[in-house]
C-alpha cells in the first residue's frame, strides 16, 4: 500500500512549470538503493517531459539520504553546480527543510529566489517559515489499508496485491509564480 509516487512527483514538476519555473532541480533519494526514490525520480522525469522542459540529470539532480542534514549538503552541491535553478523538488519534507536552510545560508530567499516543494506532508511543514508546499499522503488510510493487506497476506499468502492511496498537493508559501523577471 503506497501513494502513487510517480504520479505525485510528476504533478509537482508540472505544478512548478505552470508557475513559470523552467530550471527545476531535484534533491533526494538514492536511485539504486530505494524503490521510493526511483519511483519519485521517474515521476519527476515524466513531469519534465509532459511540461516540455529539458532535464539534465548531472546538472539538475543531487542524491541524498532522507534527512535534513543530507538535504542541506545535497542542496549546497546542486546550487553551487547550477546557479540557474529557480525551483527545487525535494523528495521528502525533511530534505526540503535542509534545502531551505541551505538556500538561506547561500544568501538567498525562499520563495523569492528559489521555490521549493517537499513530499510527505509532515506536521513540521506547516510550522516552518515559509510554510512548505508539499505532497501530502493520507497516512491514516495508508496505515489502515496496510494492516488490511497484511492480514490478507497472512490468510492468502499467494495472493499478492498492491494498492495506492490518493495524494494532495498542499500549497504553502514556499513557491512563487515567476513573471518573467528571473
Indicate where each model-derived feature is located:
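Bacterial carbohydrate/catabolite-sensing allosteric modules
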Residues: 1-182
Amino acid at each position: 500500500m503506497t501513494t502513487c509516487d510517480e504520479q505525485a512527483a510528476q504533478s509537482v514538476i508540472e505544478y512548478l512549470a505552470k508557475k513559470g519555473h523552467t530550471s527545476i532541480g531535484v534533491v533526494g533519494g538514492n536511485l539504486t538503493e530505494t524503490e521510493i526514490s526511483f519511483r519519485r525520480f521517474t515521476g519527476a522525469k515524466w513531469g519534465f517531459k509532459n511540461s516540455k522542459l529539458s532535464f539534465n540529470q548531472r546538472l539538475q539532480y543531487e542524491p541524498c539520504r532522507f534527512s535534513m542534514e543530507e538535504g542541506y549538503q545535497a542542496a549546497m552541491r546542486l546550487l553551487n553546480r547550477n546557479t540557474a535553478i529557480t525551483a527545487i523538488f525535494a523528495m521528502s519534507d525533511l530534505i526540503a527543510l535542509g534545502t531551505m536552510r541551505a538556500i538561506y545560508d547561500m544568501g538567498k530567499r525562499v520563495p523569492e529566489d528559489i521555490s521549493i516543494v517537499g513530499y510527505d506532508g509532515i506536521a513540521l511543514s506547516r510550522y516552518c517559515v515559509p510554510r512548505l508546499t508539499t505532497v501530502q499522503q493520507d497516512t491514516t488510510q495508508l496505515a489502515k489499508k496496510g494492516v488490511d493487506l497484511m492480514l490478507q497476506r497472512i490468510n492468502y499468502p499467494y495472493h499478492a496485491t498492491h494498492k495506492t492511496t490518493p495524494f494532495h498537493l498542499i500549497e504553502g508559501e514556499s513557491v512563487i509564480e515567476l513573471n518573467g523577471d528571473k
